[in-house]
């Protein structure tokens, strides 16, 4: 079975949700028999990740936190991964970024340095929250939690990035349809977030099939990575 590494830390409210999603993704990995390990808190640094990659040799890396087009950040918002600089440490693994914007440059750079596959978003990953700070009970964030749970489940159960992508798109479509029927005044904002996230999904890797957004889908050797997030608070 695969070795899955979860990388996440809490710096602010968005990363509270990111860390929660990372834990849910790791839970899906364990359900099908994969082994998991976590790099959390103050250990989420460039040196910490490199040490984990060398010692644990994960097949899949889940990276959850703030990101930009060419960077993923960790403890204290310090840069953990930077494209064309230290992303070669991900060689031979696969990654899933729960993060903003990493699909623009960092994901392609990692693949060019030897990563087998990596997924991310080409826009800011956005969602609505109820302002209470408890992701598991947040009715507005539930649609976004469902995406991470069901898409990662499809990946771990089938070993196919294509299934990850297709299930993810289906979840977005179903959640959009649900919110279109809602009379909640926040519903239009939730729908806008769903549409943005759905349009920004990308998966890159050697031999990947093209998808409408320009990324790719492919069979997976185990690894998840996660990046950065943007959130919208319901006032």
Q: Regions from the language model: what does each represent?
A:
Residues 32, 91, 112-114:
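Short, structured coil segments at secondary-structure junctions
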Residues 67-91:
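A short, glycine/acidic-enriched catalytic loop
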Residues 213-229:
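A short, hydrophobic C-terminal helix/tail in secreted or cell-surface proteins
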Residues 103-210:
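Active-site-proximal C-terminal subdomain of hydrolase catalytic domains
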Residues 229-235:
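C-terminal membrane-anchoring or membrane-association module
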């Amino acid at each position: 079975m695969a070795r899955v590494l979860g990388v996440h830390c809490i710096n602010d409210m968005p990363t509270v949700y990111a860390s929660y999603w990372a834990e849910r993704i790791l839970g899906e990995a364990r359900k099908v028999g994969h082994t998991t390990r976590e790099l959390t808190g103050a250990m989420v640094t460039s040196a910490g990740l490199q040490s984990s990659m060398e010692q644990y040799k994960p097949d899949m890396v889940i990276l959850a936190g703030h990101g930009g087009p060419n960077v993923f950040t960790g403890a204290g918002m310090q840069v953990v991964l930077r494209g064309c600089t230290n992303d070669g440490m991900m060689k031979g693994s696969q990654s899933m970024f729960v993060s903003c914007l990493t699909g623009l440059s960092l994901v392609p750079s990692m693949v060019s340095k030897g990563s087998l596959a990596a997924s991310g978003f080409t826009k800011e990953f956005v969602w609505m929250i109820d302002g209470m700070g408890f992701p598991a009970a947040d009715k507005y964030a539930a649609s976004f939690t469902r995406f991470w749970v069901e898409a990662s489940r499809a990946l771990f159960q089938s070993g196919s990035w294509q299934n990850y992508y297709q299930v993810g798109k289906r979840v977005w479509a179903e959640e959009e349809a649900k919110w279109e029927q809602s009379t909640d005044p926040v519903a239009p904002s939730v729908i806008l977030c769903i549409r943005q996230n759905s349009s920004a999904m990308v998966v890159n890797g050697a031999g990947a099939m093209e998808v409408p957004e320009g990324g790719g889908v492919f069979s997976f050797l185990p690894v998840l990575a996660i990046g950065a997030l943007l959130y919208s608070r319901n006032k």
